[in-house]
Amino acid sequence: MSENLFGLTVAADKGLDDLQCQRLLSENRRYQEVMLQYRCALKALESRLEILNEEFSLQHDRNPIESMKSRLKSPSSIMNKMQKRGLPLDFPTMQANIMDIAGVRVICSFEEDVFFLAKCLKDQSDIEIITEKDYISHPKPNGYRSLHLTIRLPVFFAEKEIHVPVEIQLRTIATDFWASLEHTIRYKKNLPINAEIETELKECADSSREWDGKMEHLLHILT
């Protein structure tokens, strides 16, 4: 193990030596200034989502958002991703090419809430949509279902306005339950996944989609 200037350990097997780590994080203040932009972008986005949630609750007597969780990529994750893509380890390159440094996962009550929130965000005039990947209408082969948006939104500081990219994942409670446990089974145990387990995981994903459909149907009956 090696340690960079910020006391963060970077595994040697990830291909980063001390020099490479410190080229990106050579100055603590510069790093903090850059990451402040991403932290503030998360706050700005969460505020917009909370406003939409409260407005919807007032109009429909329920909340479309069950929970939100935000995160910033760790320095080692950022550097490893840049190295895998053959990018120079500097801040301008990082900011221009790594679009998922800041991320928000939004867990919604129903599938229709996912698309409602996505539309509301896309309709906001100062938000730029960088990418949109609809894995709900077109699930991944393993059954994964979620709507991914990469957006760029303005963050207003005392003397400047900066447009910062944020990755948003919107999914239902049922999908989040499946995705969390699937990730644990597939990656945390560090064991090979055979065809039988793959099939069962896919069946569980299909079941979670069936639950979503049934619960949404019941919602419409009751409303």
Give residue spans per PLM region.
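Generic short alpha-helical segment signal, independent of protein family or function
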Residues: 50, 83-87, 122, 126
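Long beta-strand-rich cores associated with HINT superfamily self-processing modules
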Residues: 95, 108-215
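A glycine-rich, hydrophobic loop/mini-helix early in the fold
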Residues: 55, 60-101
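Generic solvent-exposed, charged/amphipathic alpha-helical segments
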Residues: 42, 46, 50, 79, ...
